[in-house]
Every structure is written in structure tokens, then in C-alpha cells.
């Protein structure tokens, strides 16, 4: 937050250690961070979800993949939007980059989809829908965030 990458890494490692100790996450084979649109990434210089995902993947012994999911439409900031506006804002904003490549990865039994903050769940749900098109129901997709905004 505000460029404090060290704190983000620290809290991400703590969450990753907690998750690694849980039977619910021991079988995670891949961690996928929610992508930023390329313009926002360029402006900010980094994707905080990737930083969090890297630490959690390391603690879980899982592979982190930033190349599989893309934000194909700039959605703008959602901080002042209503729940319905947020839902409409992210609908169709995410796509699988290379379906063939992803289909080759279907031996992964459990994917962890990660975002930095959870408000309404619309962003994570839009990403989940994009991944579910490619991955069969036998592949479990869990979600995790480092933060939660109440009353969004």
C-alpha cells in the first residue's frame, strides 16, 4: 500500500505460513494473482496481487503463474462504486490468455486465485468465471485476499 512492498511481503508470508499449516490448502499446485490492466501496471510499476501471490506460492510450494489470466479491459478504480456498478464494471474484463496452454495444465488439482483486497467479490468472481471456462469442475479453485473492506 502506497509503495510499502516490504510490509506487503511480510504479511503475505505470514498468511502463506498459516495457509500451509491448513489441510485446506496443502494441495494447491498453482497460485494465480488477479491481473492489472497493462496501463495501470505501467503507471503503478507493480501489481500488489503478484507480490502477495509470490510469497504465498513460496510458502505453499506452489507455482505462481501471472501469464495465464489477463485483464483485457481497463476497469478504472472501483473505490467509490456501488455493488451493482462494480459488478458491471468487471463483467467480461478478464480472459484466459492462452487456452491451449491452460488446458495442458489441467493436471493441477487445486488453484488459488488471489487478489489484494476483497470488497464485494465481483473481481474474484469475474476471474473465477474466466478460469472455469478452461478448467474442468474437477479442478478446485479457491480464492484468498490479504485484506477485506467491510461495508463496501
Which residues are covered by each model-predicted region?
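Conserved PRPP/pyrophosphate-binding segment of the phosphoribosyltransferase/PRPP-pathway fold
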Residues: 1-113, 120-152
Amino acid at each position: 500500500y502506497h509503495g510499502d512492498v516490504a510490509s506487503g511481503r511480510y504479511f503475505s508470508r505470514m498468511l502463506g505460513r498459516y495457509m500451509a499449516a491448513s489441510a485446506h490448502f496443502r494441495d494447491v499446485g498453482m497460485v494465480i494473482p488477479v491481473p492489472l490492466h497493462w496501463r495501470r501496471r505501467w503507471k503503478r510499476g507493480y501489481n500488489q496481487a503478484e507480490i502477495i501471490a509470490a510469497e504465498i506460492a513460496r510458502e505453499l510450494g506452489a507455482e505462481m503463474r501471472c501469464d495465464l489470466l489477463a485483464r483485457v479491459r481497463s476497469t478504472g478504480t472501483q473505490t467509490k462504486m456501488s455493488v451493482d456498478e462494480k459488478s458491471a464494471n468487471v463483467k467480461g474484463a478478464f480472459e484466459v490468455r492462452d487456452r491451449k496452454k491452460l488446458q495442458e495444465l489441467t493436471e493441477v488439482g487445486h488453484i488459488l486465485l488471489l487478489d489484494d483486497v476483497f470488497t464485494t467479490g465481483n473481481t474474484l468472481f469475474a476471474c473465477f468465471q474466466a478460469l472455469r471456462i478452461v478448467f474442468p469442475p474437477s479442478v478446485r479453485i479457491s480464492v484468498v485476499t490479504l485484506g477485506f473492506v467491510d461495508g463496501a
